[in-house]
Amino acid sequence: MSSRSPDELLRIEGIRKTFPGVVALDSVDFDLRRGEVHVLLGENGAGKSTLIKMLSGAYTPDAGRILAGGEEVRIHGAQDSERLGIATIYQEFNLVPDLTVAENIFLGRQPRRLGMIDRKRMDADAEVLLKRVGVNVSPRARVRELGIARLQMVEIAKALSLDARVLIMDEPTAVLTSEEVDKLFAIVRRLREDGVGIVFITHHLEEIAALGDRVTVIRDGRSVGQVPASTPEDELVRLMVGRSIEQQYPRERTDAGEALLKVEGLTRDGVFHDVGFEVRAGEVVGIAGLVGAGRTEVVRAVFGADPYDAGTVHVAGAPLRRHDVNAAMAAGIGLVPEDRKGQGLVLDASVEENLGLVTLRSTARAGLVDLKGQHTAAERIAGQLGVRMAGLGQHVRTLSGGNQQKVVIGKWLLANTKVLILDEPTRGIDVGAKVEIYQLINELTAAGAAVLMISSDLPEVLGMSDRVVVMAQGRVAGELTAEQATQDAVMALAVSTHTGNSPHSGGTDGTEASRGH
């Protein structure tokens, strides 16, 4: 790496970290200067989280060294990290819900007067910090009363209370609205002007040019390049995944076969009305629409998770009993839900146990689980999907987002699913892992399965769908072939003023285009 700059706050040289069966980091170099935003970029599982845990004291390196202000340091815990002026804001906030904002900011460091906590001074000091980060919230408010964006500002205020010279932000925009992202960026720029060095981890390539100064790319646990933030996105993608992605949405179309899923007249009062569509073998049908269009509600009803009042669902020509998940699964329908962590996985169970969730009962012999058979099948499917893990016994919670999603899809592959419903299949997944999910979709349809996909990423819907069903206000506004489906054509249907089932009718919804359900 380059010789030390006088503005250098932090330097990592040749860091290596291993866990049983896994080399998490190998010969990683990184440096941070005063008053800059240095973006740390890499796929899920590349080693970014391990690196920031080194700097926050959660892990210690097996080899290499960390320098702060030019001096080699050893960080053995959070106190060492704080003493060096390093503060980390993780995706899951480190705040106590039942304490006030001020109590959280100064937790363990409350100002005292005559042996008692000086609440007046603590609240006043907290107010100064909150104003500095531009958030209008009372220091006496309970943290549990705050939304995500304000919680994040409290975390930043807490970091500033430690006189942090280095601020590490792990995917800070992941759950923010576009307006909240703009406010966060304004605060980050202000901190940069104040001389704070910021390590900014993001999946969103468009955020790099908007906010960053330099980018270090990590791939497979190694630092593979350090480039200016103005570097074109195509080059960043090539560095990140180790190959050029010529086609972002590599759909491999096959001839469609028989209708495996047929929905007619599906109605749930006040939610969706007279919804009809079909998905044929070898086909991907995307459902597009605006926020509140009813897309997720419809597919949950098809899967039997939610009730409906009228209409029919047929799988491979046979009628499906309504509001019966077991019947849907037995008929060959699988659902990969939007909330994979809350609904699609048992986070504290192993990869093997999660892969066997759907097939546990069907593979039992005389009422006993066939553990050997389950293990063999899980091993086969994990290998087929390319799940990056230490072994089948690894807890799913510790996998990256892309690998978690592969496990959710894998459990349905084990069950030989005929119709797979994907709700936000690539949300929170980096660009390399997205392509791997798209290839899985191709493999499914090549094998004769039918795929029904909802996504708030309209280019993804257009790029991967053979046909696009557009919904508006709980109705089908129209249907487009892959050739007809452009962004303008989809949005014209999604915001048109009349609804119905003709290919060019539509509905209204005064909300954000292509994001939500």
From Swiss-Prot:
Coiled coil: none
Reaction catalysed by this enzyme: D-ribose(out) + ATP + H2O = D-ribose(in) + ADP + phosphate + H(+)
Localization annotation: Cell membrane
Membrane topology designation: Peripheral membrane protein
Disordered: annotated span: 497-517
Disulphide bond pairs: none
Binding residues for ATP: 42-49
EC numbers: 7.5.2.7
Gene3D superfamilies: P-loop containing nucleotide triphosphate hydrolases (3.40.50.300)
Alphabetized InterPro entries for the sequence: AAA+_ATPase, ABC_carbohydrate_import_ATPase, ABC_transporter-like_ATP-bd, ABC_transporter-like_CS, P-loop_NTPase
Claim: Isomerase is one of the keywords in the record: no
Domain named ABC transporter: residues: 10-245, 255-498
GO cellular component term of the entry, any: plasma membrane
GO molecular function: ABC-type D-ribose transporter activity; ATP binding; ATP hydrolysis activity
Keyword terms, alphabetized: ATP-binding, Cell membrane, Membrane, Nucleotide-binding, Repeat, Sugar transport, Translocase, Transport
CDD domains for this protein: ABC_Carb_Monos_I, ABC_Carb_Monos_II
Self-association state and partner proteins as the record states: The complex is composed of an ATP-binding protein (RbsA), two transmembrane proteins (RbsC) and a solute-binding protein (RbsB).
Function of the protein: Part of the ABC transporter complex RbsABC involved in ribose import. Responsible for energy coupling to the transport system.
Family to which the UniProt record says this protein belongs: Belongs to the ABC transporter superfamily. Ribose importer (TC 3.A.1.2.1) family.
Protein name stated in the entry: Ribose import ATP-binding protein RbsA 2
The organism of origin for this protein: Streptomyces coelicolor (strain ATCC BAA-471 / A3(2) / M145)
Top-level taxonomy: Bacteria, Bacillati, Actinomycetota, Actinomycetes, Kitasatosporales
Gene: rbsA2
